């Protein structure tokens, strides 16, 4: 019997995050939700990552309300989100009580699969979120942030997979955020994990470097069970490979695929119009759809590269880009080879720019790099360069154990602080994650409600 390969659709989260910086309002995709629900996906990734921040910051949407509406419109498909371990959806570590309540509420509001990762692959930073997911009855997808370095070996990754399984992971995700995993590497890594544990494996990559289609085919050959794809109008470039193309290729190779082609055609026709609107208004820059092989040379993810370019442009120093690109891998090595994913990619990039423009390495460092060297972000894959660490920290003490253990509970004090303002625990969680954004959102919501009531009284 043919082996089945399942699909996760990313258009509602990572595809639009990668191509249009997550600026996809709910009303733009709402008409398609019941159609997506009929397509036959393993799951639809629709929440987490940058969506929470962007809903509040730019779209004036309640992210919790968005999740509830998606759930109501898609009763037959698993909903999936991306969670940054102890960072949840923010950029620094939070206390355990916040992590636990956030996961509990995400599941209560409709989440089925929580993909949990840590920027350093430090499982200590994933443990609380993993346990909370299992306790809430959802699927915990333990995630490896894929990267290459002298210390990132298959043996190391397999060891991590075994730890994640012990923590309660039901599936394992290999997350190649930079799109640098080649076909042979995918085959070897999936084979190594499959030999070690009997669990479904999901591979997530990006088309940035042009490798993704080939990488998926070899991964499937090695036994990968699930792949992440984007409906064709939102595929390619910094996004994922096209759903329809992968389904076609896999069927031709003799694999079973559950997707309904008639439904994916309907999705494609609809999202073409949405994509064209974003191209017309300049939100979708054609360059995001292009292939960029520089990542293979410098091992710098595409999103990080564009950030470096915009930073240098603002400083009138775009002519120093080549120096910064050569400095970035050196800073990464100094910092113990962290995977270049949020938030470590930003920290390493900013430090590389600073080193080049200051004309002296580590003359000036960000507070994030200082916190990183103190151990606040967790255990680094390799030790940080001792000489540089001493220069940065001076007499400052390093964190022992897990940084979150030093943080005081935050939920109860925030509930008290927001009495009369927060309508629910979801509001409390939004405020803890992004206080300024949530405060503004609550004010706007209140004003809207008051105007609405005033209007209806006049009407009556």
Mark where each language-model region is:
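N-terminal amphipathic alpha-helix/helix-capping segment at the start of soluble metabolic enzymes
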Residues: 1-20, 67, 72
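Conserved, mostly hydrophobic/aromatic
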Residues: 7, 15, 36, 116, ...
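Terminal or standalone catalytic/regulatory effector modules within metabolic enzymes
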Residues: 31, 37-55, 285-295, 299-460
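Active-site beta->alpha loop and helix N-cap motifs at the rims of alpha/beta catalytic domains
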Residues: 48-165, 172, 179-183
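Glycine-rich phosphate-binding active-site loops on the catalytic face of alpha/beta enzymes
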Residues: 116, 176, 222-239
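Catalytic cores of alpha/beta
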Residues: 152-164, 209-225
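C-terminal helical cap(s) of enzyme catalytic domains, especially alpha/beta-barrels
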Residues: 235-257
């Amino acid at each position: 019997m043919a082996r089945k390969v399942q699909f996760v659709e990313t258009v509602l989260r990572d595809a639009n995050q990668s191509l249009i910086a997550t600026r996809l309002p709910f009303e733009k995709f709402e008409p398609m939700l019941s159609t997506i629900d009929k397509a036959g996906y393993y799951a639809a990734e629709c929440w987490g990552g940058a969506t929470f921040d962007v809903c509040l910051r730019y779209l004036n949407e309640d992210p919790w309300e968005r999740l509830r509406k998606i759930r109501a419109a898609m009763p037959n498909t698993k909903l999936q989100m991306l969670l940054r371990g102890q960072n949840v959806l923010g950029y620094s570590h939070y206390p355990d009580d916040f992590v636990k309540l956030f996961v509990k509420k995400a599941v209560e509001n409709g989440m089925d699969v929580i993909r949990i990762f840590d920027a350093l692959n430090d499982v200590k930073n994933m443990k609380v979120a993993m346990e909370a997911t299992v306790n809430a009855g959802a699927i915990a997808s333990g995630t490896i942030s894929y990267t290459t370095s002298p210390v990132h070996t298959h043996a190391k990754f397999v060891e991590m997979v075994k730890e994640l399984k012990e923590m309660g992971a039901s599936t394992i995700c290999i997350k190649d955020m930079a799109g640098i995993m080649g076909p042979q590497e995918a085959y070897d890594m999936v084979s190594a994990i499959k030999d070690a544990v009997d669990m479904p494996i999901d591979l997530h990559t990006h088309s940035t470097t042009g490798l993704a289609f080939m990488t998926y085919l070899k991964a499937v050959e090695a036994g990968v069970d699930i792949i992440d794809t984007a409906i064709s109008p939102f595929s390619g470039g910094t996004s994922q490979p096209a759903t329809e193309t992968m389904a076609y290729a896999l069927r031709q190779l003799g694999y079973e695929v559950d997707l309904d082609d008639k439904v994916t055609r309907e999705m494609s026709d609809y999202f073409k119009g949405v994509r064209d609107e974003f191209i017309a208004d300049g939100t979708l820059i054609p360059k995001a759809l292009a292939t960029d092989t520089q990542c293979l040379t410098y091992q710098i993810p595409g999103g990080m590269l564009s950030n470096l370019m915009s930073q240098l442009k603002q400083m009138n120093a775009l002519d120093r880009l080549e120096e910064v690109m050569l400095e970035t891998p050196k800073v990464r090595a100094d910092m113990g080879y962290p995977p270049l994913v949020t938030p470590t990619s930003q920290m390493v990039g900013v430090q590389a720019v600073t080193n080049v423009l200051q004309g002296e390495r580590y003359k000036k460092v960000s507070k994030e790099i200082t916190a990183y060297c103190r151990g606040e972000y967790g255990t680094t894959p390799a030790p940080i360069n001792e000489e540089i660490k001493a220069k940065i920290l001076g007499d400052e003490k390093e964190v022992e154990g897990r940084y979150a253990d030093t943080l005081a509970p935050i939920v109860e004090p925030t509930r008290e602080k927001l009495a009369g303002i927060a309508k629910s625990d979801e509001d409390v969680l939004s405020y803890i994650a992004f206080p300024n954004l949530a405060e503004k959102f609550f004010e706007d919501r209140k004003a809207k409600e008051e105007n609405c009531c005033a209007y209806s009284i006049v009407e009556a």
